[in-house]
């Protein structure tokens, strides 16, 4: 529904997974890690010689022994990974701006993977592109999200709450000072 509201037209510019993969020369796999694993059997048959498989995160390829995502040898496997949340990326795109992105080439079967990757990075509005690998992107993304965004912030908030409680603040006061301020 969101795609249609944004002007995509079913059967003209909007397709189901199989039809999109069949028609496309660059198959963009922009799904959650769990979703990539579940749709991989659907996508793989359409990855014919010369196509490119594009990711925005290195997880599925880095741990392909666990995800089962093993691309055919005769396709390019590329990545442009915006350094921000999907919500931020979408908001900035609608404003005509972009986020910095890392890029990587896992497999260059056509000899054109670099050109495709840089063009896609520019096309999505990346303000700055810097080279990485799928493995480094996956590791830095997971440690950044799980360590800094989830773990560190939560730990700081908990520590502040506990210090306030230890110093005589009521639970309500400690909570509000921690969360509301």
Feature-to-residue mapping (PLM):
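Helical "substrate-binding/catalytic lid" subdomain
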Residues: 123-181
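Rossmann-like NAD(P)-binding element
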Residues: 4-62, 70-85
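Rossmann-fold dinucleotide-binding core
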Residues: 54-146
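Electropositive phosphate-/nucleotide-binding environments in soluble metabolic enzymes
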Residues: 11-14, 30-33, 37, 107-115, ...
């Amino acid at each position: 529904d969101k795609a249609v509201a944004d002007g995509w037209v079913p059967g003209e510019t909007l397709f189901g997974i199989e039809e999109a993969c069949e028609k496309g020369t660059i198959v963009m796999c922009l799904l959650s890690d769990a979703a990539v694993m579940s749709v991989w059997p659907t996508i793989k048959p359409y990855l014919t010689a010369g196509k490119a498989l594009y990711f925005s995160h290195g997880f599925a390829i880095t741990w392909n022994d666990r995800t089962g995502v093993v691309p055919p040898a005769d396709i390019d496997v590329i990545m442009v990974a915006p350094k921000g949340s999907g919500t931020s990326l979408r908001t900035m795109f609608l404003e005509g701006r972009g986020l910095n992105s890392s890029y990587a080439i896992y497999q260059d079967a056509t000899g054109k993977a670099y050109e495709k990757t840089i063009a896609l990075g520019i096309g999505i509005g990346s303000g700055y592109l810097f080279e990485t690998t799928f493995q480094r992107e996956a590791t830095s993304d997971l440690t950044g999200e799980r360590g800094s965004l989830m773990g560190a912030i939560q730990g700081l908030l908990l520590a502040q709450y506990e210090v306030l409680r230890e110093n005589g603040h009521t639970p309500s006061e400690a909570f509000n000072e921690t969360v509301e301020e």
